[in-house]
Amino acid sequence: MEVDTTTLIPIKFEKIMQSRTYTCIVLASEEKKFGVYTNLESGKSIQAHLTKVAPARPSTHQFIDHIFQGLEVSVKQIVINELQDTIYFARIFLEQKRGDLLHIVEIDARPSDSITLALTHKAPIFCMPQVHTNAIAMEDTAL
């Protein structure tokens, strides 16, 4: 199943902010910026991708990416689809072409993992309108 992107809000990855205990993934639409908070490992994985620093051994995200490459699967898009008590939820859409057949699979995933894979695959990030409305805006001074 594919989500109708005409009702979705396009989101751009802005940056990550890391502390000693958590990572904030800053996302932005045309109207506002908001943060998705996650663990340090997710932040390190995004940072490694952005700086193109390869770790000695593959990270979990790199491992997943190797599986995708082997199965000829690509990340089509991600959708941040729900917000409950400051916890975001996401769906990742995977695409596999086999000859004339096209398979699209929708999977529940953590936003941090979804965003990391979207950045790796240069896939678009979207947000459901109600999630965007309820996301707490970050002030530019806090960034």
Features from the language model and the residues they span:
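Divalent-cation
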Residues: 1-143
